């Protein structure tokens, strides 16, 4: 019996694994600290973040499956589009420990700018292989722009809080 669904499900779920690991930092003391910060009025309610990230992670994960399948697996030809994807995913997963764990809002902002750049490069690389896979990243790019602005305003408005006024430690 062929289990051709396994790569589709596996690659779709991979981004969420890092999201679950990052959730470790977004609880307890990290949440209390974040709740104490000044945030802009357009800050989304906390309950919306899990569904948003779940949807974005699933879309990017399925997009990676499309690229993987189109290029015949983890081939030399897949190195750039899947390598960029892996790089942006690692940078994405690094954000919660930087922001909530280390409370380094400035460095978290730098991380988000890097994620945005590498995610844009990923989208362009994917578009050459599969425009539908690239389109699955469009909502993610929009969310990254929003998240970057939110991170900036939180950093700016909380200067002097732990990690709020400095980029270097």
Curated annotation (Swiss-Prot):
Expression sites by tissue: Highly expressed in adrenal gland.
Q: Which GO molecular function annotation, any one, does this entry have?
A: transmembrane transporter binding
GO terms for cellular component? cytosol; membrane; mitochondrial outer membrane; mitochondrion
Q: Which residues form a coiled coil?
A: none
**GO terms for biological process?**
adrenal gland development; behavioral response to pain; cellular hypotonic response; cellular response to lipopolysaccharide; cellular response to zinc ion; chloride transport; cholesterol homeostasis; contact inhibition
The superkingdom listed in its UniProt entry is: Eukaryota
What membrane topology does this protein have? Answer: Multi-pass membrane protein
Stored InterPro entries: TspO/MBR-related_sf, TspO_MBR
- Function of the protein: Promotes the transport of cholesterol across mitochondrial membranes and may play a role in lipid metabolism, but its precise physiological role is controversial. It is apparently not required for steroid hormone biosynthesis. Can bind protoporphyrin IX and may play a role in the transport of porphyrins and heme. Was initially identified as peripheral-type benzodiazepine receptor; can also bind isoquinoline carboxamides.
Give the record's subunit note.
Answer: Interacts with TSPOAP1. Interacts with MOST-1. May interact with STAR.
Family, according to the entry, reads as follows:
Belongs to the TspO/BZRP family.
List the protein's name: Translocator protein
Q: Which gene encodes it?
A: Tspo
């Amino acid at each position: 019996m062929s289990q051709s669904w396994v790569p589709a499900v596996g690659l779709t779920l991979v981004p969420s694994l890092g999201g679950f690991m990052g959730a470790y930092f977004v609880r307890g003391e990290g949440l209390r600290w974040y709740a104490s910060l000044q945030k802009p009025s357009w800050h989304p309610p906390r309950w919306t973040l899990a569904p948003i990230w779940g949807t974005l992670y699933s879309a990017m994960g399925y997009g990676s499956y499309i690229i993987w399948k189109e290029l015949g697996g983890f081939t030399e030809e897949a190195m750039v589009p899947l390598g960029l994807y892996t790089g942006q995913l690692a940078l994405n997963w690094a954000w919660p420990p930087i922001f909530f764990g280390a409370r380094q809002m400035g460095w978290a902002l730098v991380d988000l700018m890097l994620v945005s750049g590498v995610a844009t490069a990923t989208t362009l690389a994917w578009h050459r292989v599969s425009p539908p896979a690239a389109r699955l990243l469009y909502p993610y790019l929009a969310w990254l722009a929003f998240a970057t602005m939110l991170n900036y305003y939180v950093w700016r408005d909380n200067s002097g809080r732990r990690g709020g006024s400095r980029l270097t430690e």
